[in-house]
Amino acid sequence: MTEYSLPTMNLWNNSTSDDNVSMMEAFMSSDLSFWATNNSTSAAVVGVNSNLPHASSNTPSVFAPSSSTSASTLSAAATVDASKSMPFFNQETLQQRLQALIDGARETWTYAIFWQSSVVDFSSPSVLGWGDGYYKGEEDKAKRKLSVSSPAYIAEQEHRKKVLRELNSLISGAPPGTDDAVDEEVTDTEWFFLISMTQSFVNGSGLPGQALYSSSPIWVAGTEKLAASHCERVRQAQGFGLQTIVCIPSANGVVELGSTELIVQSSDLMNKVRVLFNFSNDLGSGSWAVQPESDPSALWLTDPSSSGMEVRESLNTVQTNSVPSSNSNKQIAYGNENNHPSGNGQSCYNQQQQKNPPQQQTQGFFTRELNFSEFGFDGSSNRNGNSSVSCKPESGEILNFGDSTKKSASSANVNLFTGQSQFGAGEENNNKNKKRSATSRGSNEEGMLSFVSGTVLPSSGMKSGGGGGEDSEHSDLEASVVKEADSSRVVEPEKRPRKRGRKPANGREEPLNHVEAERQRREKLNQRFYALRAVVPNVSKMDKASLLGDAISYINELKSKLQNTESDKEDLKSQIEDLKKESRRPGPPPPPNQDLKMSSHTGGKIVDVDIDVKIIGWDAMIRIQCNKKNHPAARLMAALMELDLDVHHASVSVVNDLMIQQATVKMGSRHYTEEQLRVALTSKIAETH
């Protein structure tokens, strides 16, 4: 991805004119309510300074890391300070990390800032300064276009536009002009993000400083908590409409995220920050995949690399990934992109490489230019040795200021961002008429603003030299084509030719080329394997072939268990049916109820019988007290035989004329209740002869 970073020289050095300094002092000392009053933000600086050992004690600066460099391409200005320490991470990927963090999150974040930790003096604590930033904007920005006509609101907007124009004039060296692109509304969150460049925090002060000092994340959500915070920056953010501010420390600084929505604390976000911003693991050397729902041609605050980075025809040296340069032109790409009705749907901004003799490379800094361009560039890598930046125009708002009359360099075949599309006179006039008719294009593409503060070379695959005709190898991010914006403007948007075949399902993004389609297919396949691994209990190995084999074995085991369960179920059903049939079978009618004591006259004598029965399951305990005459023991055995009762134990004892019999029996074909068995025995034993 071709990116440009803010210069590493102090913008507000002694060479700045008194008029410029006075203008910036007035800019910083504004009496409006959106300026913070703490010491870290009251300094009259807006520049970027990474030369920390030379930072002034009374002029705090915003610190930014510079990119790694090759010794063969160091400029003279970059080698003046021999004590400058080498960077420890790749600045090119820092912008991609911030963009991937916001665009890949489930929550809706408005901006992300990386505060870099630097040491100004060995005896003083570390200082957090501006390292990089990415502004996504608010989803409902197009819906909340308020027609506010109050004098205070108009005065505030005029002040912001004036400051931006004068800031551009100060940096570019051109007289302030009336660029109509600056007349666009500068929202509160955009303004808060811009003025964050001027802030720095000592370790332990402010919300980022507290997060770095305590090495623990700080999550402030809710308007009441923001307003009650002791940090001036947090209260300032609440005044600008933010509802959630998060500061997560990392090894080299603090990542700050803000949102206009109320977002609860999420451990996934903190883990993602720790992974993305762990520079010690050399994660910065790779390219980050573009999120499907985000536009990779997000707009950047960029610095086109200057003399230390340009590709010279006279030098046949191969450039490394990134080259620090103290001399560069600063550009801000801000707003949405315009749809281009041409066939290929792309437009190229002209980038100018300043060619200066070696004896002129030691000057403080080149003329800088703030360009709020109407187009964003997609960061696609350069081919065939040229440095032309391929850009995708889209519809949206335009803020464009800065001098756009730079000349193109003859050797590099590139131009400076001029804010004018290279379409033709007719399309140029049409774009001018459509500047003010911006419409909402989507939540993730509305009002994006991104800042890079380091010097970054385009992708490592770019070849230098005049005869570089080889195509460089690119990552998936660099090779993928930016998705076409769906615009609802009155002008008919470009109809990109699509391949024949089935239409994608509702809500599914159609891949733009085979590389993106293959990536989506592999990602989908990996997700399915992850889900399969989660449900298979015994995984022998972690490779996909073993996982499939274990899944097959597990499925076969489940099938066998299912078959066994079905057979057991059938057996239980058959047993239940048999019991039901047996219960429906009518048994012998029970004998009529009789008293426990029955009297019958036999030859003028009365026979008294007392029977006690206890039932336990299919077993019964019987105890009988009666007269010993007429052989009651024999009659009991006969009754037990007739009732189909098996005798397990029996005892007979006689006391005078009373016989006591005890028996333990087991019921056979029929189950009797206590009452039924007692009545049956009474009728058998009490019979008279």
UniProtKB/Swiss-Prot annotation:
Oligomeric and partner information: Interacts (via N-terminus) with MED25. Interacts (via N-terminus) with JAZ7. MED25 and JAZ7 compete with each other to bind to MYC2. Interacts (via N-terminus) with MTB1. MTB1 and MED25 compete with each other to bind to MYC2.
Gene induction: Induced by methyl jasmonate. Induced by wounding. Induced by infection with the fungal pathogen Botrytis cinerea. Induced in fruit by storage in cold. Induced by hydrogen peroxide and infection with root-knot nematodes.
Role, per record: Transcriptional activator that binds to the G-box motif (5'-AACGTG-3') found in the promoter of the jasmonate-induced gene LAPA1. Acts as a negative regulator of blue light-mediated photomorphogenesis and positively regulates root growth. Promotes growth in response to the phytohormones abscisic acid (ABA) and jasmonate (JA). Binds to the G-box motif (5'-CACGTG-3') of the RBCS-3A gene promoter. Acts downstream of the jasmonate (JA) receptor to orchestrate JA-mediated activation of plant responses.
Protein name as it appears in the record: Transcription factor MYC2
Any one GO molecular function term: DNA-binding transcription factor activity
SUPFAM superfamilies found in the cross-reference section: HLH, helix-loop-helix DNA-binding domain
Domain bHLH: 509-558
GO-annotated biological processes: defense response; positive regulation of DNA-templated transcription; regulation of DNA-templated transcription
Origin: domain of life: Eukaryota
Residues forming coiled coils: none
Subcellular location: Nucleus
Disordered, as annotated region: 316-361, 420-519, 563-602
Natural source organism: Solanum lycopersicum (Tomato)
Residue ranges with Low complexity bias: 350-361
